[in-house]
């Protein structure tokens, strides 16, 4: 029985899916105007673990995470680089897949892009206007916040208590200062689309509502994202979605905590942004992932090299004990099981499941993994060789590895670097263009030997490590 903390009710609740055996999950993804920073990596890793645990428990998980590819930041970057918004978005979507792939994050069931849902967004807004929940003013379209009586239920604020502040848009053409933008009138030189309200582009909040509705339906099981998105983004999503769909938007809301850098908030003004693209060249991505899950997802986490080194030592401890079990298994001859060890291993697995069932407590799950490593080391020192016991150790190690997404072995020194793989893919593409299919097949086989799988996508050939 899985329980999770629901931000909506501010309490832990037993998870009950809308459809038995299936979890529909939406996670707010990045705005693709730059490489992701470790603040973006945290939800990617945390909710990947949530997904993996649901799958371990036998659920089918439909995991949707969007790309925001229409946004003020992208438009600003487009002007700075003199490149189209789409070109920049494509580049950083590719970079995102590379970065989270290095962190062993499973590919989403779907990664919708705003640009591909523009007609859906326009129709959604039109429906809200027709029902009186939205209105046109000066070329923009706004949501009537006060008309949605439940506004504030996620952030636990009442409409009367809300004040117009830095996080709430202000404008003279609104009926009410609390109203927020659904559609922005086009500005000269900016990307825009034709609509019944005039040429323009959508506001940020409406984008997620529409993509979630299109991909998962009127009501989803779990909506997740960073704590910083709780208000106003998720609050506004609820208002738009429930006004449009006449149904609850999400039954459970999950929010992960902030990341601080050396006990300071990560911000551009402090110049302490840590890009995943850069840091995984200095730190083993497996260590970074292990570090990220060493703290409960709702708690803040402090990033510094001392703590990362501690995570590295912890991961080495787990891997070394697993290697010792493998080495002992290679020379094992006695097949008689030692029931006391089997019972202890199963007790640790039960401990792991208990803490994961309790709001996905990865910090305590890692403690269980350390307990397993300690027991494994004890067993190896006794010079006993029961193949059944060794086999059970390996099974439970693999469960922990699969659920937490941390490989049991580090990358081999002779493993191809990503840059080398990309170069081979480019060479293969050129060989195919030149009709040198023998060379193209040779490269594919070479990559296959390295457990690298090529995938043809609309954006070109991508690869993943098996």
UniProtKB/Swiss-Prot annotation:
This protein's UniProt keywords: Aminoacyl-tRNA synthetase, ATP-binding, Cytoplasm, Ligase, Metal-binding, Nucleotide-binding, Protein biosynthesis, Zinc
Cellular component GO terms, alphabetical: cytosol
Subcellular localization, as worded in the UniProt entry: Cytoplasm
Main localization, broad class: cytoplasm
Subunit structure: Monomer.
Family: Belongs to the class-I aminoacyl-tRNA synthetase family.
EC top class, as a word: ligase
Positions that bind ATP: 268
Superkingdom as given in the UniProt entry: Bacteria
Catalytic activity: tRNA(Cys) + L-cysteine + ATP = L-cysteinyl-tRNA(Cys) + AMP + diphosphate
Protein name, as recorded: Cysteine--tRNA ligase
Chain positions of motif 'KMSKS' region: 265-269
Cofactor: how and how many bound: Binds 1 zinc ion per subunit.
Residue span of motif 'HIGH' region: 30-40
EC identifiers of the protein: 6.1.1.16
Pfam families in alphabetical order: CysS_C (PF23493), DALR_2 (PF09190), tRNA-synt_1e (PF01406)
Molecular-function GO terms, alphabetical: ATP binding; cysteine-tRNA ligase activity; zinc ion binding
């Amino acid at each position: 029985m899985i329980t999770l903390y629901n931000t909506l009710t501010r309490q832990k609740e037993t998870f009950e899916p809308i459809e038995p055996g299936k979890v529909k999950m939406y996670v707010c993804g990045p705005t693709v105007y730059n490489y992701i920073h470790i603040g973006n990596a945290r939800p990617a890793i945390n909710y990947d673990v949530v997904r993996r645990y649901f799958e371990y428990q036998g659920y089918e998980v439909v995991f949707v995470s969007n790309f925001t590819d229409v946004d003020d930041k992208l438009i600003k970057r487009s002007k700075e680089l003199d490149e189209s918004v789409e070109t920049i978005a494509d580049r950083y979507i590719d970079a995102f897949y590379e970065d989270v792939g290095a962190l062993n994050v499973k590919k989403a069931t779907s990664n919708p892009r705003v640009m591909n849902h523009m007609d859906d967004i326009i129709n959604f807004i039109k429906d809200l206007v027709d029902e009186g929940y939205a209105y046109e003013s000066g070329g923009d379209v706004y949501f009537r916040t006060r008309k949605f009586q439940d506004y504030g239920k996620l952030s636990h604020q009442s409409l009367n208590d809300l004040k117009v502040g830095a996080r709430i848009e202000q404008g003279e053409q609104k009926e009410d200062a609390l109203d927020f933008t659904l559609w922005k009138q086009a500005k000269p030189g900016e990307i825009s689309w034709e609509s019944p309200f005039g040429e323009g582009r959508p506001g940020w909040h409406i984008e997620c509502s529409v993509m979630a509705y299109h991909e998962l339906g009127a009501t989803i099981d779990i909506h997740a994202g960073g704590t910083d998105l709780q208000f106003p983004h998720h609050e506004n999503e609820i208002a738009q979605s429930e006004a449009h769909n006449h149904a609850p938007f999400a039954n459970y809301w999950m929010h992960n905590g902030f990341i601080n850098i050396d006990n300071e908030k990560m911000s551009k003004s402090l110049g302490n942004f840590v890009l995943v693209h850069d840091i995984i060249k200095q730190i083993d991505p497996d260590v970074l992932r292990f570090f990220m899950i060493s703290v409960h997802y709702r708690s803040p986490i402090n990033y510094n090299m001392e703590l990362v080194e501690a995570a590295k030592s912890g991961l080495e401890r787990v891997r070394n004990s697993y290697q010792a079990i493998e080495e002992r298994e290679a020379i094992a001859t006695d097949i008689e099981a030692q029931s006391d060890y089997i019972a202890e291993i199963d007790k640790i697995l039960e401990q792991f499941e208990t803490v994961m069932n309790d709001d996905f407590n990865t910090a305590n799950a890692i403690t269980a993994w350390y307990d397993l490593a300690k027991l494994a080391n004890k067993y190896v020192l006794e010079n006993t060789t029961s193949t059944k016991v060794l086999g059970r150790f390996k099974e439970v190690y693999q469960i922990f590895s699969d659920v937490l997404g941390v490989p049991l072995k580090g990358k081999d020194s002779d493993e191809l670097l990503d840059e080398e793989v990309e170069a081979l893919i480019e060479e293969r593409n050129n060989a195919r263009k030149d009709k040198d299919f023998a060379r193209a097949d040779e490269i594919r086989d070479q990559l296959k030997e390295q457990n690298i799988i090529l995938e043809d996508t609309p954006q070109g050939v991508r690869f993943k490590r098996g």
